[in-house]
């Protein structure tokens, strides 16, 4: 993880919903126990631990509620940022034909087409969370989504599955981006 980018959460209770989420502005490459906060179903911290939850806590809660996910991971990579800008006006990005698609939970064939929705990055987190939650209810098969110019959100039943989804989707984004570049300009002679 680059610097303080991204945020991670794990569901610690379902009824009521509670998350352990990384605090804002901490290095995600060197997370310590003090960098993780407990939050309730409305996003407010529980307990007296220092730090503040990520501004994007509402998105983690929306995903945990809608997907009954056990973990939610948000990353900022070059490929998710660039491709979300290139395909933002299309509302999403289709990933298909790659063997690595089978690394996504429930996908059994490389012939699968994964739709990765792209949302405009919005500082009104409750409004954005509402749009994300509506999409997740309407599109139960998606494994993640992109925030335009920002990064990837994905989830899993547990932290290991969520991490696998990050790895698979980031691979697919890079492969798609390189293929698009090769189609437009020919193969990169320097890689």
Where are these predicted regions, by residue range?
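Glycine-rich flexible loops
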Residues: 1-191
């Amino acid at each position: 993880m680059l610097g303080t980018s991204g945020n991670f959460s794990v569901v610690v209770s379902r009824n009521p919903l509670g998350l352990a989420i990384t605090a804002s502005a901490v290095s995600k490459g060197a997370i310590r126990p003090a960098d993780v906060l407990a939050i309730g179903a409305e996003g407010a911290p529980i307990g007296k631990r220092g730090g503040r939850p990520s501004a994007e806590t509402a998105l983690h809660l929306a995903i945990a509620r809608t997907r009954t996910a056990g973990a939610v991971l948000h990353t900022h990579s070059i490929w998710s940022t660039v491709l979300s800008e290139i395909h933002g006006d299309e509302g999403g990005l289709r990933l298909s034909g790659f063997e690595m698609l089978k690394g996504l939970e429930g996908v059994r064939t490389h012939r699968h087409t994964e739709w990765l929705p792209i949302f405009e990055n919005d500082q009104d987190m409750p409004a954005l969370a509402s749009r994300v939650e509506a999409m997740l209810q309407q599109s139960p098969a998606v494994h993640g989504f992109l925030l335009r110019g920002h990064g990837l959100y994905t989830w899993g039943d547990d932290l290991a599955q969520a991490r696998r989804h990050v790895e698979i989707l980031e691979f697919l984004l890079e492969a798609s981006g390189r293929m698009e570049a090769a189609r437009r300009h020919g193969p990169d002679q320097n890689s």
